């Protein structure tokens, strides 16, 4: 008898909303030269092919920084930098073109592989590269001639979209030609950023040395707003002044993410090229694995509606089974849905609370407080409480009270104090369950 993995089945089911959400969307992937050189490169290519097979339109932009440096060293050449940009003279341009050409062939070859007994078995991918990007020289800055280092002049988005619509993967590198027929060395992060903006991509994804932005505890920061990302850039620039990776790929991509976000790209993702499956975990799981730069938070606090009843019931059922919450039927929830506030993330209800006002006493009960077990390490309970406080004040309520059997200390930390049964509004006193012996706590607004 074959052993069937329930984890595999569960993973497929949980990823279904994301498969449906991402189908037909355009995503730009930044693949630095460090990622190509890493031993996880083959797995990254397999994951990109999987994305394509799920109906995602994929544009891959590759960098070649370490490969260029290796070739320069072999030829005993050095290239100066000005404002963290390589000055590309004639000799350096030849090396850059050689490195970029080799990487283009290597990536194309891996995407073309379809051997049996491999994740690419049966895959028939068309990889298209071309003069989609037109460059122009950076020129002279502070008396320094950048030579063949350039910037983007324009992008042929119509041609790229036609190629994507035909089912091909678009592959672009750091070399682009100009209207005069010259070649220029571009920053691959800038190429990826501008492609995402001009194509109206749904996502910009960058493979970095770390699993996104790392906090003081060594954990990836799940989400950053642009202004927060700017603060991170300032801190990283100061703390990693001698770290070449942070001063090139990671910081440049983070800067590009901010620009893309402010230009209308909904989300930019920073993930590690060292972690097997990071791309799939980031795109097809509830929590992701790296850092997102977003214009607005993926989590929303809002008033519940009739369509949220199923999600609320699913959230509170385990707590009802444990006796932490009083049971509520679907019918009761339908009648009281207007009193509920929820926290929603990517279509999943991860938190809820209800507010029952007693207008004559100018008091309100905060009840049915629940947070999804995977999200209890944040401040979402406090988020719901603050929302309830704001809502209570708007309804001319002076005090909020709760009945709890398990969360006494948390509520006391938020300023609640213990009161007796006689504190409760008359209508609530008659419903108090003396066998349950819930603690009653109040908060002055």
Curated annotation (Swiss-Prot):
GO cellular component: cytoplasm
Pfam families: AA_kinase, Acetyltransf_1
Pathway the protein contributes to: Amino-acid biosynthesis; L-arginine biosynthesis; N(2)-acetyl-L-ornithine from L-glutamate: step 1/4
Annotated EC: 2.3.1.1
InterPro entries, alphabetized: AceGlu_kinase-like_sf, Acyl_CoA_acyltransferase, Asp/Glu/Uridylate_kinase, GNAT_dom, NAGS_kin, NH2A_AcTrfase
Record PROSITE patterns: GNAT (PS51186)
Domain N-acetyltransferase: 299-438
Disulfide bridge positions per record: none
GO MF term list: L-glutamate N-acetyltransferase activity
Alphabetical keyword list: Acyltransferase, Amino-acid biosynthesis, Arginine biosynthesis, Cytoplasm, Transferase
Subcellular location: Cytoplasm
Biological process according to GO: L-arginine biosynthetic process
Catalytic reaction list: L-glutamate + acetyl-CoA = N-acetyl-L-glutamate + CoA + H(+)
Family to which the UniProt record says this protein belongs: Belongs to the acetyltransferase family. ArgA subfamily.
UniProt xrefs under NCBIfam families: N-Ac-Glu-synth, PRK05279.1
HAMAP family in the record: N_acetyl_glu_synth
Name this polypeptide is given: Amino-acid acetyltransferase
């Amino acid at each position: 008898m074959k052993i069937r993995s329930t984890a595999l089945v569960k993973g497929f089911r949980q990823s279904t909303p994301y498969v449906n959400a991402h189908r037909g969307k355009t995503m730009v992937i930044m693949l630095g030269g460090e990622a190509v050189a890493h031993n996880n490169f083959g797995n990254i290519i397999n994951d990109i092919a999987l994305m394509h097979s799920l109906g995602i339109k994929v544009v891959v932009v590759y960098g070649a920084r370490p490969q260029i440096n290796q070739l320069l060293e072999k030829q005993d050449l050095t290239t100066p930098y000005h404002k963290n940009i390589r000055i590309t003279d004639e000799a350096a341009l030849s090396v850059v073109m050689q490195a970029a050409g080799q990487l283009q062939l290597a990536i194309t070859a891996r995407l073309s592989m379809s051997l049996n007994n491999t994740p690419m078995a049966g895959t028939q991918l068309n990889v298209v590269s071309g003069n989609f990007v037109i460059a122009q020289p950076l020129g002279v800055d502070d008396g320094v001639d950048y030579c063949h280092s350039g910037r983007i002049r324009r992008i042929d988005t119509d041609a790229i979209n036609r190629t994507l619509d035909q089912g091909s993967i678009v592959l672009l590198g750091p070399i682009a030609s100009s209207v005069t027929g010259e070649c220029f060395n571009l920053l691959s992060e800038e190429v990826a950023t501008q492609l995402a903006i001009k194509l109206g991509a749904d996502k910009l994804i960058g493979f970095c040395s770390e699993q996104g932005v790392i906090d003081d505890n060594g954990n990836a920061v799940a989400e950053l707003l642009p202004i927060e990302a700017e603060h991170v850039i300032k801190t990283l620039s100061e703390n990693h002044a001698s770290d070449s990776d942070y001063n090139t790929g990671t910081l440049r991509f983070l800067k590009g993410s901010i620009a893309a976000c402010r230009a209308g790209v909904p989300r930019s993702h920073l993930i590690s090229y060292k972690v097997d499956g990071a791309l799939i975990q980031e795109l097809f799981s509830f929590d992701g694995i790296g850092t997102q730069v977003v214009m607005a938070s993926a989590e929303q606090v809002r008033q519940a509606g009739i369509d949220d009843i199923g999600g609320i019931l699913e959230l509170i059922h385990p707590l009802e089974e444990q006796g932490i919450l009083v049971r509520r039927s679907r019918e009761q929830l339908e009648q009281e849905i207007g009193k509920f506030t929820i926290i929603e993330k990517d279509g999943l209800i991860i938190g809820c609370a209800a507010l029952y006002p007693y207008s004559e006493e100018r008091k309100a009960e905060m009840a049915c407080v629940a947070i999804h077990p995977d999200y209890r390490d944040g401040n979402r309970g406090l988020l719901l409480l603050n929302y309830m406080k704001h809502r209570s004040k708007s309804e001319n309520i002076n005090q909020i009270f709760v009945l709890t059997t398990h969360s006494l200390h948390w509520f006391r930390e938020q300023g609640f104090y213990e009161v007796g049964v006689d504190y409760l509004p008359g209508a609530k006193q008659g419903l108090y369950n003396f066998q349950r012996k819930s603690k009653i706590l109040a908060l002055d607004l």
